[in-house]
Amino acid sequence: MKKTDKYVSSLLEFLDNSPCNFLAVDTVKKILTANGFKEKKIDDKMTVKAGDKFFFTKNDSAIFAVQVGKKKPADTGFKIIAAHSDSPCFRIKPASEIPGDGGILRLNTEVYGGPILYTWFDRPLSLAGRVLLKGKDALHPVTKLIKVDRPLMCISHLAIHFNRAVNEGNPLSKQKDMLPILAKINRDMEWRNTLLNLVADELQVEADDILDFDLMLYDVNKANLFGLNNEFISAGRLDDLSMVHAAITAITEAKDKNATLVAAIFDNEETGSGTKQGAHSPVLGNMLLRLVMALGGDFEDYGRAVHRSFMISADNAHAFHPNYPEKYDPTNHPSLGGGPCIKVNANCKYMSDAHSAAIFKSLCEGAGSPFQNFVNHSDVAGGSTLGNILTGQLDIEGVDVGNPVLAMHSVRETGSCDDHVNMIKVMKQFFS
């Protein structure tokens, strides 16, 4: 198998092991540990030296990996790649069991982010997330991660015979229509703790010890390749776990030993990044400051280091859809397999400008990768991403990029094998 093929198979495995943000971070931890990175606690005293490789997590759903360079950050700046661990999905609400007529037990859910709702219907779903158990005292609950590997639930459509407008853009109620079926119950069955008992059995703990949970639905169908030559990737959470995988691959294979390298994986980008583990928080800036000071610098050195730094903010872009050409800019519509996209917006929704885009194009040329421009159709509003949020926290130059995907925010998105391999090459070039 070629190394480039290994990158794709590694991505598929990574996606299957990462059904939600918490499991994605746990999978990243395992990859980093296997490549010589040591875990630190965020509240440990920062003691590092040149050549150290370490990581720490925030809220179990964000992770920051660092390779300390031989030279002072004030002289070289930091090289940073940012991505995010979360994807649109359904979260399970507290007190979630809803018994109904016909003896059907459903779970009460809440929409996280902006998923394409219709894509979640009529497919096998299961549970993943974290569970908080009683600990040694009230301030120290114990965290357990959970991933139920078997199909547990299904969100079922109403038959077309009862809804003739279903194929005509019939609107959905998130509260009524998107509740998954979990079990068949009878009158004598105690249903109120069905979910907690299920979770307790999976974790082999007592249900009474469960204090709370963050549980999400996920599609149990595995990531796969398709196309005449297996050139396409079909999977959930390509946005943005494919960029997480590329960033972590790049830092574990990095050749630059002089500059300090950082892979920053934030959470909650899909809901605005306004959490303690999101890009709006000071967590990255605080870590960089502590790094500079641990290496003998001061606040002046920190300011110089950040100003001399460069960041690649990696979040997927919209690929050109041949069925809907009118939705795209007539001259800047990236295609699957055409290479990483540089995101540009006249109203500064992205951190890219001509200078930072030129740097990324040079990295692409050095890596032997094609590149594309992504610009929104002028009559179609686009989304935002990590870049501009982070520039509100750090005085840093950077570029917003991402690989093109179709059906962004669907339960299964479509990407390109070549694009993923090329993005890894470019990120490795940045870290070389």
Question: Can you describe what each PLM-predicted range is?
Answer:
Residues M1-S432:
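N-terminal hydrophobic/helix-forming segments and targeting peptides
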